């Protein structure tokens, strides 16, 4: 009885304790298989990432992430001059910051600070007032 329990425990340890090499990254990696034939305009791209053959992909590539998240990544040859220039442009350009609450500028708000028609329920920030002398 004790031997069968020890054997079962050993099998469990071996089954779950040995790291797996195939697919150990959590899933299949998306790889570019060919490069875009057209130059990609900077206005349609928000960022990029690098694809390396050493990480399991067949070709080196730069994957440009489009501004519209519903669109597919755009693959480009890292040796092309326009690709290097676009990467430098994206490195210099700070990523756009969204407003803290996603609010639009209040339209129709009165001077008292009440919400207007276009405020969409967003809070206005109060200006800190310095106390006046005693």
Curated annotation (Swiss-Prot):
GO molecular function, one term: CCR chemokine receptor binding
InterPro entries (alphabetical): Chemokine_b/g/d (IPR039809), Chemokine_CC_DCCL (IPR034133), Chemokine_IL8-like_dom (IPR001811), Interleukin_8-like_sf (IPR036048)
Keywords assigned: Chemotaxis, Cytokine, Disulfide bond, Inflammatory response, Secreted, Signal
Signal peptide start-end: 1-23
Organism domain of life: Eukaryota
Pfam families per the UniProt record, alphabetical: IL8
Compartment list: Secreted
Region of interest (Disordered), ranges: 88-134
Disulphide linkage map: 31-57, 32-75, 103-122
Entry GO terms, CC: extracellular region; extracellular space
Compositional bias segments (type: Basic residues): 112-122
Expressing tissues: Highly expressed in high endothelial venules of lymph nodes, spleen and appendix. Intermediate levels found in small intestine, thyroid gland and trachea. Low level expression in thymus, bone marrow, liver, and pancreas. Also found in tonsil, fetal heart and fetal spleen.
SMART domains in alphabetical order: SCY (SM00199)
Comp. bias regions, Basic and acidic residues: 123-134
Family of this protein: Belongs to the intercrine beta (chemokine CC) family.
Record note on quaternary structure: Monomer. Binds to CCR7. Interacts with PDPN; relocalizes PDPN to the basolateral membrane. Interacts with TNFAIP6 (via Link domain). Interacts with GPR174.
Record's function text: Inhibits hemopoiesis and stimulates chemotaxis. Chemotactic in vitro for thymocytes and activated T-cells, but not for B-cells, macrophages, or neutrophils. Shows preferential activity towards naive T-cells. May play a role in mediating homing of lymphocytes to secondary lymphoid organs. Binds to atypical chemokine receptor ACKR4 and mediates the recruitment of beta-arrestin (ARRB1/2) to ACKR4.
Protein name: C-C motif chemokine 21
């Amino acid at each position: 009885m004790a031997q069968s329990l020890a054997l079962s425990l050993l099998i469990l340890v071996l089954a779950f304790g040995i790291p797996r090499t195939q697919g150990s990254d959590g899933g299949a990696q998306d790889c570019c298989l060919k490069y875009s034939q057209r130059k990609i305009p900077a206005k349609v791209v928000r960022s990029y990432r690098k694809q390396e053959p050493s990480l399991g992909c067949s070709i080196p590539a730069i994957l440009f992430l489009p501004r519209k998240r519903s669109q597919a990544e755009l693959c480009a040859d890292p040796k092309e001059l326009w690709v290097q220039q676009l990467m430098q442009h994206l490195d210099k350009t700070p990523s756009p910051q969204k407003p803290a609450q996603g609010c639009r500028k209040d339209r129709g708000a009165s001077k008292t600070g009440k919400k207007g028609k276009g405020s969409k329920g967003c809070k206005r920030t109060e200006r800190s007032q310095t106390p006046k002398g005693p």
